[in-house]
């Protein structure tokens, strides 16, 4: 079956950069890690009918972070719709494609950065605010792996090829398939890596990108367009955060960007 997407083109406004506050002496991270492996029962959360992939990524990230660091909390379908409606205020999940429901003009997807700004300023439907968020240089795999090792999760924005739908259905890693057209923009949760692949969750299943996809470019557009770390309250005080993040640099960059002081207390 064809699945839905829903990531709008990135707006690329100023944002924190993870590489600037990554500690100069980065703690050694394992050659491979799969933070997703301990969890099963991932849910579709509406992305088979509506373009809510970005809201689903929020729910999946909150589940992974809480399950790893505290007590698991998987946001509900109702909460996913609530977050989706922050950028689609007229959307009604019970509506139809000819009115205001899935597939209608009120089902317009989300911009990743705008969603992260909302989570930082207001908090998600689960009542938790993001402490901060930052862009990761997805072209630097060492930085990508360091981000995953420190935070256990990446919010990714990608372009999906038509061929990737078939690879997903067959349980194969996603690759850059020559000649396959771009099918849509998608937001997903990255949650692990090997020497060659990045692991992720989409459409309720764990799969992975082959290196050819990660480095792929189609018609001048990178297949991986966005990668973000989100600092949640659960990260504060953890050994990985304390050793991997230059907190003084993070605070300075945050103040330079926003004009406000960053609070890093639990």
Language model regions located:
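Catalytic-core signature of thiol
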Residues: 1-266
């Amino acid at each position: 079956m064809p699945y839905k997407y829903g990531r709008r083109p990135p707006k690329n406004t100023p944002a924190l950069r993870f590489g600037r506050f990554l500690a100069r002496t980065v703690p050694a991270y394992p050659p491979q890690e799969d933070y997703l492996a301990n969890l099963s029962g991932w849910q579709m959360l509406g992305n088979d009918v509506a373009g809510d992939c970005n809201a689903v990524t929020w729910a999946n990230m909150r589940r992974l972070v809480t399950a790893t660091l505290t007590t698991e909390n998987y946001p509900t379908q109702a909460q996913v719709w609530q977050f989706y409606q922050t950028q689609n205020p007229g959307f009604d999940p019970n509506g139809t494609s000819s009115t205001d429901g899935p597939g209608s003009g009120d089902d317009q997807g989300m911009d990743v950065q705008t969603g992260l700004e909302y989570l930082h300023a207001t908090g998600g439907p689960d009542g938790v605010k993001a402490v901060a968020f930052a862009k990761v240089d997805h072209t630097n795999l060492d930085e990508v792996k360091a981000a995953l090792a420190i935070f256990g999760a990446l919010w990714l924005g990608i372009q999906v090829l038509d061929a990737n739908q078939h690879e997903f259905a067959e349980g194969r890693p996603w690759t850059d398939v020559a000649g396959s057209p771009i099918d849509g923009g998608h937001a997903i949760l990255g949650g692990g890596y090997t020497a060659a692949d990045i692991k992720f969750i989409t459409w309720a299943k764990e799969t992975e990108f082959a290196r050819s996809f990660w480095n792929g470019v189609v018609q001048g557009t990178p297949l991986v367009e966005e990668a973000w770390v989100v600092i949640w309250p659960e990260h504060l005080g953890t050994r990985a955060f304390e050793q991997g993040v230059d907190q003084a640099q993070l605070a300075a960059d945050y103040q330079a960007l926003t004009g406000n002081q960053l609070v890093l207390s639990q």
